[in-house]
Amino acid sequence: NHTYSHQKGWGMSLERYIEDVDFANDLIHSELFRPPYARITPAQARALSQRYKLVMWDVLSRDYSRSLSPRKCLKNVTKHLEPGAIVVFHDSEKSFRNMRYALPRTLDKIRKLGLKCKTIEL
């Protein structure tokens, strides 16, 4: 779950933010939650952590940036790969060009480094 409307939570009331997250969950049924923009207020985190496992990332591909070349997107990710890293790629029209180039090459690099992709445990 990543909210329904991808709003910046720090600019929303707690109640409205929780409603948005729950609305998304009614559609996708996930016990995981990652806040948009990796930002969440302490009150939102406390409320959501009672119902969801909050997951943050530590490697941002920036694949959504149209000013970023696909090669630079790949470099943004591969220079930060390490055991336990959580990498963010986006599934959107805006990010498609960079993600299509960088994701398979990132997976190849992960294999070459002897790292493994794992499911986040609940």
Residue ranges and their predicted role:
Residues 1-72, 77, 81-94:
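Metal-dependent polysaccharide deacetylase catalytic core of the NodB/CE4 family, i.e.
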Residues 97-122:
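C-terminal domain-boundary segment and adjacent tail
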